[in-house]
């Protein structure tokens, strides 16, 4: 009896030591990656620190005069939006009687070249509903490990839908290797979950708002069709992708079976996202939306603002892109030669995001803290990068202010 207990305790101790060794190895590996070099134009493992505080939950000392670059979600509704919201014709959307919402869903379906649409509370809900409508419990999605669906949506597909994920590396342009995708598709075997869905993200947030290459998206869609899988696009910023790719949103959407787009990001509406796809898919998503608490009533008040956002979408997004390119260039022009290996803004393939890289003795915390002391809010994106997202509440005059504060930061180093 004593021998059996001793054997069990020895095994438990060995198991604990193995866990500690694995954890220490992981930490050492992460530290090694942190000391590696970044290519400056996208992501690398060196930026991926799991213990970096989440900038998505950090509160700021925002005032009414702040220049807020943390996200394009921080905008406030325009006067035109507020008027449309106040005057919206509404009904009970659960009964299908909110005409403003119905018009928005139909408008978006036509805009994206799909059969039907569903207005939902958020992009996170929209992506989850899409996954649930494509997959049964016990099935699997294929998704990039840096994609918003996997990294910043709490693994909700597992929490609420019992769906697993195979995650793949993401390249600096936001794509995944096509061979990796194909190899991740499961063979039909009773020991394995069935692969059902490939999830892509356009534009790709973590790589700095990169617009996915058209030919890559076409290849992913062809691969999915050949292997009997579907493609869902997290198109939270699909309008940014369309402007950057110089094409229509319907062309971008044609490379996916289903798409989710946020109204509350670059388009500037206060709340809501749209999911579009085949009618039977939308019917399933609408059914699941109720279970998630998303069956709203007079949603037309919010849909009215989304209509206004769509009316001005192209002009709004183009202005953001131009300001982002200008800001990145101004930051680099303002950086003296001796600091250019320490602080720089990535200028390649910019949409509405500017990523400022801090290294070689300059930390992201130093720069974000200095900005905040001067009423400028930027996001600590990860261990080496600050994200500044241009939005319609940021003016050309604001860019001058940002760069002047940046110059002061460099002088006190």
From Swiss-Prot:
Keywords: Lyase, Pyridoxal phosphate
GO CC list: cytosol
Cofactor annotation: pyridoxal 5'-phosphate
GO biological process terms on file: glycine biosynthetic process; threonine catabolic process
Pfam families documented for this protein: Beta_elim_lyase
Molecular-function annotations in GO: L-allo-threonine aldolase activity
Similarity section: Belongs to the threonine aldolase family.
Record flagged with keyword Nuclease: no
InterPro entries found in the cross-reference section: ArAA_b-elim_lyase/Thr_aldolase (IPR001597), Low_specificity_L-TA-like (IPR023603), PyrdxlP-dep_Trfase (IPR015424), PyrdxlP-dep_Trfase_major (IPR015421), PyrdxlP-dep_Trfase_small (IPR015422)
Membrane-spanning segments: none
Residues annotated with N6-(pyridoxal phosphate)lysine modification: 265
Taxonomic superkingdom: Eukaryota
Source organism of this protein record: Caenorhabditis elegans
Identification of the protein by name: Uncharacterized protein R102.4
Gene3D superfamilies in alphabetical order: Aspartate Aminotransferase, domain 1, Type I PLP-dependent aspartate aminotransferase-like (Major domain)
């Amino acid at each position: 009896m004593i021998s059996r207990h001793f054997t069990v305790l020895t095994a438990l101790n060995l198991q604990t030591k193995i866990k500690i060794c694995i954890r220490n190895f992981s930490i050492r590996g992460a530290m090694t990656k942190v000391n590696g070099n970044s290519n400056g134009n996208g992501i690398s493992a060196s930026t991926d620190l799991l213990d970096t505080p989440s900038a998505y939950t950090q509160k700021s000392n925002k005032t009414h005069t702040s220049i807020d670059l943390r996200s394009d979600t921080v905008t406030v509704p325009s006067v035109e939006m507020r008027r449309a919201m106040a005057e919206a014709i509404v009904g009970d959307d659960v009964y299908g009687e909110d005409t403003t919402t119905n018009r928005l869903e139909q408008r978006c379906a036509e805009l994206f070249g799909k059969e039907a649409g569903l207005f939902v509370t958020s992009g996170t809900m929209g992506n989850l509903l899409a996954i649930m409508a494509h997959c049964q419990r016990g099935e699997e999605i294929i998704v990039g490990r840096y994609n918003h669906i996997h990294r910043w949506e709490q693994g909700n597909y597992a929490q609420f839908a019992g769906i697993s994920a195979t995650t793949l590396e993401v390249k600096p342009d936001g794509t995944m290797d096509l061979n990796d995708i194909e190899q991740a598709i499961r063979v039909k075997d009773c020991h394995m979950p069935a692969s059902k869905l490939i999830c892509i993200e356009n534009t790709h947030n973590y790589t700095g708002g990169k617009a996915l290459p058209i030919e890559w998206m076409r290849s992913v869609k062809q691969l999915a069709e050949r292997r009997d899988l579907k493609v869902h696009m997290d198109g939270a910023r699909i309008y940014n992708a369309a402007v950057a790719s110089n094409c229509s949103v319907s062309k971008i959407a044609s490379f996916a079976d289903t798409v989710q787009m946020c109204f509350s990001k670059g388009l500037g509406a206060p709340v809501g996202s749209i999911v579009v796809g085949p009618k039977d898919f939308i019917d399933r998503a609408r059914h699941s939306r109720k279970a998630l608490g998303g069956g709203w009533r007079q949603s037309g008040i919010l849909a009215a603002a989304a209509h206004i956002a769509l009316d001005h979408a192209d002009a709004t997004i183009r202005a953001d892109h131009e300001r982002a390119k200008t800001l990145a260039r101004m930051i680099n022009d303002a950086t003296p030669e001796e600091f250019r290996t320490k602080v720089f803004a990535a200028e390649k393939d910019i949409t509405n995001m500017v990523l400022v890289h801090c290294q070689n003795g300059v930390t992201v915390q130093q720069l974000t803290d200095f900005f905040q002391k001067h009423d400028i809010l930027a996001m600590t994106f990860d261990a080496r990068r600050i994200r500044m997202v241009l939005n319609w509440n940021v003016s050309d005059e604001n860019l001058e202010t940002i760069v002047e504060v940046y110059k002061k930061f460099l002088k006190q180093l």
